[in-house]
Design a protein with these regions (language model features):
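Short glycine-rich anion-binding loops that position phosphate/pyrophosphate groups of nucleotides
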Residues: 11, 64-65, 115-118
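Short amphipathic alpha-helical face segments that pack within enzyme cores
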Residues: 37-40, 76, 80, 97
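Glycine/Thr-rich phosphate-binding loops of Rossmann-like dinucleotide-binding domains
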Residues: 14, 69, 119
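Generic, well-ordered alpha-helical segments
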Residues: 30, 34-37, 69-73, 90-91
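Phosphate-handling active-site elements
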Residues: 48-54, 83-94
Length: 134
């Protein structure tokens, strides 16, 4: 089975389909019409990957921090996908995801996300076996 990951927390709408490895992804600059753009992106990567939506077994959603309205749109679309397919929705903190992706096992990490209007969210992490902790 496949997983769908969605991020609408920033200037870009990003979606990806993966199992043990990345199968297909898309990242598109969002100016207006986030809902339509997100649905179109999901449709495009499923078609490109030749995967039926019914083959998706879980949706991972970036729940922020980030742009408030875009996060709400991402949540609404993700809930609709999960509700229609009867699959779980797993929330993922964007700062935690960045730290985990950047960890080397040896250095402290500070993740920073622009949350609009010259405001930023950040968090410090330290390495532990298998990942990072706040």
């Amino acid at each position: 089975m496949y997983s769908l990951s969605i991020s609408t927390s920033g200037k870009y709408i990003s979606v990806a389909i993966h199992d043990d490895k990345l199968i297909s992804s898309s990242s598109v600059l969002s100016e207006n019409g986030t809902t339509n753009l997100l649905m179109k992106s999901i449709d495009e990567i499923t078609k490109k990957s030749r995967i039926e939506k019914s083959d998706i077994s879980v949706v991972y959603l970036d729940i922020g921090p980030g742009y408030y309205t875009s996060l709400r749109i991402g949540l609404a679309v993700a809930q609709g996908v999960c509700g229609s397919l009867g699959i779980p929705l797993v929330p993922v903190n964007g700062l935690d995801a960045l730290a985990f992706a950047a960890h080397t096992g040896h250095r402290k990490i500070c993740t920073i996300i622009d949350i609009k209007r010259e405001e930023y969210a950040f968090c410090l992490y330290k390495p532990v076996p298998g990942g990072v902790v706040r």
